[in-house]
Amino acid sequence: MMEENMTVYNINLGIGWASSGVEYAQSYRAQAFRNIDISAKFIFSDLILGNNIADLTANLGFDDDQIIWLYNFFTDIKIAPSTFLLDTFVKQNHLEQRNFILQPDNGMKELQYKSAKEKLTIVPRYNDREKGTIDQVTYVVNNQLIKRDFYSYTKYATEYYSGDTHDNHVVFREFYNGDGTIAYTQHLDGEGHELFEFPNQNYYSKTDLYREMLLKLNFKPDDIIILDRMDEDKQLVNGQLIFEHHLPAKLVIPVHADHYDKHYTNDHQVLWNNFYEYQFTHYRDVSAYVVATDRQRELLTSQQKHFNHAKPQINTIPVGSLEHLVKPEKPRKTHSLITASRLANEKHIDWVIEATVVAHKTVSDLTLDIYGEGGERSRLQDLITKNNADSYIKLMGQQDLKNVYQKYETYIAGSTSEGFGLSLMEAVGSGLSMIGFDVPYGNQTFIADQQNGYLLPYTEDWSNSRKEQLLAEAIVKNFTEADLASFHEKSYSLAESYLTKNVAKRWQQLIGELQHA
C-alpha cells in the first residue's frame, strides 16, 4: 500500500518548446504516476523567462500544480497559464490618459504604444492574440531597453536594465507576491555573481538559494527524489546539494544515456559518462538506479561489481510507455518502410536510403517514408535525388506519429546507439516488423531476431557499403520470405509490457520496496 501523503520529486533544470529525451521521460513518468495516484512534483531551476514556464510544461503534459520552479518557489504566486489581458494592462497603466499612441499593428506578437512626451515606448507581447492575453511587456527609452515585466494571471517578475548604450545588461530582477509586494530581489553584478535579497535574509549564490528550497521542501521518510539532471548550470551545483540534503527521503538515479565509453573501458578501468560519474561513485547514497532496458541493467550491474565491488539496486523501468496498442484502421500499405528520428548524422539515415535503393531493384513497389527534422535534411534530399529515388523515398518532416505507424508494414533503423528508442517502442506498439543492427540498447530490446524482424550483425569498423548491404538484404527478406502476419503479432505481444498500466506497476513496485527498505 502506498503511503497516502508521499511525494515523488523529479529534479530537472530547464525546459523549452523542443525538448530532449529527459523531458519526454519525465512526461511519460508523470502519466505513469497519475495511473497509480502518486503525487509527483517536477522541479525546474533554470531562469526561464523567455516564456511563461506554465506554457512549456503544459505542452509536455504536466499539470500546473506539479511544477516547482526555483524562482517562483519563494513567492505565493501559483504556476499558471498566461490569462492577463492586454485591456487590463492598458487600463491599469492609464495609457490612454497619458496619451500613448498605439502604432500600426503588423499582426505580429508585439504591439507598440508610444509617447513623445514621456520619450517612452511600451511593448506588450501577446501570449494568445485571439484571447487578448499578454505574457511580457518591454519598456524602451531612446531605443534602449530599460525594463521588462512578466505576466501569468498577474505580474510575477520584472527585470531592470543598466540602459548602457554599448553594454545593456540586467542589473536586478524583482519577483512578486500575488498582492504586488516584492518577495525577493535578485541582484547581478555583471561578473556572474548574484545576490538574492529577502526582507530578512540574503543568499549569496544560486546554490545557496537552491539549498534553502530543498530545506523548505521538508522531505519525509516516504518521499522519493528522482535526480534526472544535475550540475549543467554554471551557477548551480544542484546534484551535490541533493546528495547532501535528500535525507530522510530516498534518492533514485535514472540513467538516460549510455552510461560509459566503451572505447576507454577495459578490465582495469571504466570511463563513466561524465554526466553520471558522480552518481556512480557515490552509490552508497543511492537507494536505486533505474535504467530503461534489461540489457543496460545487466551491464551496469557487472561493472559496479567489478570496478566498485558494489551491489547497488538497479531496476529496469522503460522511459516511455504506450497508452494502448494501435491496430490498423485499414490494411497497411504493401512493401512500405518507415523510419523516424532527428535527421542527424548519428542516425545513419543515409545507410537506410542506400539500402532501400538496392532493395528496390528486387522489390519493385518498395517505399520508404522518413519522418523528422534536422541538420542533415538537405544532404539526405540530395542523396535521394542522386539515386533517382524521389518517387519512392520521401522526407515527410516533423509530425505526430501516434496514428501514423499503423499505416506501414515495417520499421527500419540505421542508428547505432539508442538509449531506449521511443520511436522503436511506438513502432512495435503499432505492430510493425522491425529491421535494425544488433547494438545497445533499443534495437536489442525491441527486435527479436527472426520473430518480429531482423537484428543484424554490426561491427563499427566495417565499411558503410557492407552495413548498407546487410540492411538491403534484410529488407528483401522481410518482404519476400518473412511471414509478416506473424512478425506483426510478435511485435504486439512484445509491446504489451510497455503499456502505461504495466510500466506504472513497475514504478509502484519500486516505490513500495523503497518505502519498506
Stretch-by-stretch model annotation:
Residues 389, 483-498:
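A short, well-ordered alpha-helix in the C-terminal region of glycosyltransferases
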Residues 473, 477, 497-517:
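C-terminal alpha-helical cap of glycosyltransferases
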Residues 433-437:
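Short hydrophobic beta-strand element within catalytic cores of glycosyltransferases
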Residues 335, 342-358, 375-376:
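A conserved mid-protein helix/loop that constitutes part of the nucleotide-sugar donor-binding site
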Residues 416:
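Aromatic "clamp/platform" in nucleotide-sugar-dependent glycosyltransferases that forms part
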Residues 272-277, 281-311:
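A short, active-site helix/loop in glycosyltransferases that binds the activated sugar's phosphate group
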Residues 379-398:
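Nucleotide-activated donor-binding/catalytic signature segment of Leloir-type glycosyltransferases, i.e.
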